[in-house]
Regions:
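Hydrophobic h-region of N-terminal signal peptides that target proteins for export
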Residues: 9-18
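Low-complexity, intrinsically disordered Gly/Pro/Thr-rich segments
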Residues: 140-148
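Solvent-exposed loop/turn segments connecting transmembrane beta-strands
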Residues: 28-41, 50, 81-83, 111-122, ...
Length: 170
């Protein structure tokens, strides 16, 4: 009886560990950059083995004027030329694993547009995720973006937080 119970526990634990691989998540995140900029990100993440993942994202940014007291209304912010949009992909190799949390490097590229410009970006940073029940995750990330072609905001340093929701594809 003890042997059968031990075999059942081992088989069940390997099935549960395998269930974490190749999972998909949809996520949303908010954050800001050092130059007064706010951003919102919507992404799809495909997790491969050992928490390594591919992320495909769409991001919108709003650049604030240097002096926020110049804004008399929020609508002026949306009418200004400080809006940027982009889509891209990132590879996230897992470098740190612990119980219910893991950390990944985030290396990616993006293409986008501003009102009068074309944008290309190279992204590098760190993303730390905390796992909750039923596949939900909370994450924070910090990183640097190198935006091309030559722009006044070539290097952007920022951070953000967000949530990842599991997607069940059967």
């Amino acid at each position: 009886m003890r042997r059968i119970l031990m075999i059942a526990v081992v088989l069940l634990s390997t099935v549960l560990v395998k269930a974490q691989d190749n999972s998909n998540r949809i996520g949303v995140g908010l954050g800001g950059f050092y130059r007064p900029t706010a951003f919102a990100t919507l992404f799809w993440e495909h997790e491969t083995h050992y928490h390594n993942a591919w992320e495909f994202f769409a991001e919108g940014r709003v650049l604030f004027p240097g002096d926020l007291s110049q804004l008399s209304q929020v609508s002026q912010l949306w009418d200004s030329s400080g809006k940027q949009w982009g889509v891209g992909a990132a590879w996230k190799p897992c470098l740190y694993r612990a119980r219910n949390r893991y950390g990944s490097a985030r290396i990616g590229v993006s293409l986008g547009a501003a009102p009068a410009d074309f944008l290309a970006g190279i992204h590098a940073g760190w993303q730390h995720s905390y796992a909750f029940r039923r596949g939900w995750q909370f994450y924070w990330q910090a990183g640097v973006d190198v935006m091309l072609p030559k722009r006044d905001d070539l290097f952007r340093v920022g951070a953000g937080v967000g949530i990842k929701m599991p997607v069940r594809i059967r």
